[in-house]
Amino acid sequence: MSWRASSSPAEPFDVAVIGGGINGAGIARDAAGRGLSVLLFEKDDLGGGTSANSTKLIHGGLRYLEYYEFRLVREALIEREILLGIAPHIIWPLRFVLPHHPGLRPAWLLRLGLFLYDHLGGRKALPATRRIDLTRSPLGAPLSPGRAIGFEYSDCWVEDSRLVLLNAKDAAERGASILPRMAVTSARREGALWHITAEAPHGQPAAFLARTLVNAAGPFVGEVQDGVIGSNQPARLRLVKGSHIVLPRLYDHDRAYIFQNADGRIIFAIPYERDFTLIGTTDEDHADPHETPRISDAEITYLCAAASSYFRVPIRREDIVWTYSGLRPLYDDGASKAQEATRDYVLKLEAPEGAAPLLSVFGGKITTYRKLAEAALAELRLRTEKAGWTARAPLPGGDFAPEGFAALLADFQRDFPNLSPDLSRRLLRAYGTRAWRIFTPGQDPGPPIGADLHAAELEYLRREEWAATPEDVLWRRSKLGLRFDAAAQARLARLMGG
């Protein structure tokens, strides 16, 4: 999957996007669907940075109410239901249990916050908040003694890196040129056009023209602005690291927990990949975007201690099976603490008269990427079809009702009886209705490469989803890395030419 053969310096694109995370992919999709010619550059794998290392929630952000970010919360709550409707295979409802901590926020304040949370966004698809007696409910069983009162509310889970992939794929199917592993080395204005030079690893530089340029490079937005483009505008960027730990499953039910801590922060404990529990996140300032974010010993201690103060069985660091960290490229609003920095997005337009415009994207949440894309195109004032189509058009594989997953799974198992129930469920959760394109009905899948990854799925990922390395397959197109042993990893590397 490469750029169109007609793409040449003589044929300008309407929009060029630097950055293949969720914001860049969302902008590319929206623009392509409005009939614009679109080019997207990503120096690494699509969704390989910030977007793949989130807490994997589509949520309003309950704690943002404490910082009076009512507009952000309302927009995110509205988007939560829209995204559930257009991508029900990779986004699904998740109930959260919030135990009351007598020494922290009073119960009346929690009730007030949850009342606002239920009503700010016009909730329709998800159930309302309810009070729980944790001394009698099974939901209280994993918790330490003394947790008497709790509240249960709704948000959604998302396969974050797949959300990026599906936006990029839909953009490509609508005519966009998506170029992963293609780094922009320079972009300069010449009148009403951007002259862009990009280079693939071990490849020759290629030249492109574009009428508008969007800098959605995430943690590298400042570097692109200063070094690649040469803009004089200051980049008010604050990098905040968020780290997570993954452990064997800590409890048997399907709810997530949200825990308050004495430092004012909250952490989540979330069912993960059926056999695990995900705990996170932290908030630490991070200086250098080139320094790969990794969990620190202090962060591990913090997450283990915070979760252990709520769970009946303490969390031990030796039980951790995986950790990951990501950088949030937040707009620097001058907040003194990393946890208080705004999660809202800020768009900066630089459009001198008669010159090609530049739009730089700061901040944002994965939940609000679609609205950010609409706002970005509105800022650029391109002559296009009307906004709003992305709220109605399903992402690839998402053309079924959110409540229809069980029926879809039954249909798939009927058509592919040779596949195990667990594999069928995983394929439907990853690919939705496009899972039918991976195997042919009645096909013997053959021996797996590792876990339940088969050659047919690997071929699909390489052909349709830009998968180029084992890491792409194991940690972004899926989370099979949690189940691949060393021998299976070596087999996969050989198959992929490693």
PLM regions and their residue ranges:
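Glycine-rich Rossmann-fold phosphate-binding loop(s) that bind the pyrophosphate
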Residues: 20-21, 43
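Glycine-rich FAD pyrophosphate-binding loop
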Residues: 32-52
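C-terminal catalytic lobe of FAD-dependent flavoproteins
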Residues: 154, 160-162, 170, 229, ...
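Extreme N-terminal leader/targeting segments of oxidoreductases
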Residues: 1-15, 30-33
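Flavin (primarily FAD) binding-site architecture
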Residues: 215-230
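Dinucleotide-binding Rossmann-like beta1-alpha1 core, especially the glycine-rich loop
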Residues: 56-140
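Helical element adjacent to the flavin cofactor pocket in flavoenzyme catalytic cores
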Residues: 151-207, 211
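Short hydrophobic core segments
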Residues: 18, 208-218
